Amino acid sequence: MFLIPLGLLSLVLLATPGLANSPLTLRLTVQDHKVTASWQAPFPLSNYVLYYAPYPEMNPIQSVPLGELTRLSVELPYGAAYYVAVSGEDLYGQRHLSNITYFRIKKIWHPSPGTTWQWQLTDPIDLTVEAEMFDIDLFETPKEIIQALHQRGRIVICYFSAGTYEPWRPDAPLFPREIIGNPLKDWPEERWLDIRRLDLLAPLMEARLDLAVQKGCDGVEPDNVDAYQNKSGFPISDKDQLRYNRWLAQAAHQRGLSVGLKNDLDQIPELVDEFDWALNEECFSYEECEKLLPFIKAGKAVFGVEYELSREEFCPEANRMGFSFMKKHWELDAWQEPCW
């Protein structure tokens, strides 16, 4: 969940009496050491003020007058972490406050082709598997397991569904009914989400990303990011999907998290620069692995699994292409037959 924004909001309001919450929208992008903030409102504002406070302590709050600026870029060292908000003054002298967000400057994991990995979404996690990266469930995995993997020198990626409603998740009651659509073809308990409604969906996904930070995950695997190619129950376009997937990548990077593009092969040309690696299921079975090569050409790892083919049917070609593929059971337990 978002880390005590109401506490910071109260402090900002105390520091600036008469401040009103408003449609003023603040957006952050983080790339390496560089943080860029931009803001806009649906009505004229001026005399902007930037507020920032250390994350997660929230104190002290600092303010910087920005005049008419609506965009600001700064470079900060690794380890820097701040809450940020802006306010602006309308034609009647009323000051309006933006949303409050935060960022971390952290060295993001960028795996190169050939990186070894393990994918296990069941309990208990087998810590003895020899792999550089472990991809495990965000909700089900205790923080202590993540710490144990770190002690073994492993990178930990945390899985969650970014495009479907899962009724068994602890945050399921928070999902509004109006954004819950049709069931998935092979997973009838799951239902597609209306990814066009970022106003409702973004806070829920931000909370999951914040949980990943709290648990110590090095990155995230957002699943089900291809609703536009499925019967979701909503008129989701390819442009809607690109917007949502780009937002996910930016929100992860803003928190210092590595993020992978799961499947969504047809949008790789538009998204390869936004994501740090790719994860695919069964591209050899469907004869579509060539679509993943832009990640390899960009020096980024392509992780993948086959469920039905034998190793002999896909490993030689996977290795030739520079992919990190393995054979797995459908239930994604600890068992694996890697190609490396």
Language-model features, listed with the residues they occupy:
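Sec/Tat signal peptide C-region and signal peptidase I cleavage site
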Residues: 16-20
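Bacterial N-terminal signal peptides
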Residues: 5-14
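Pro/Thr/Ser/Gly-rich low-complexity, intrinsically disordered linker/stalk tracts
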Residues: 21-44, 78, 91-106
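Recognizes extended acidic, P/S/T-rich segments that occur
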Residues: 47-79, 91-99
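Glycan-processing catalytic domains of CAZymes
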Residues: 106-340
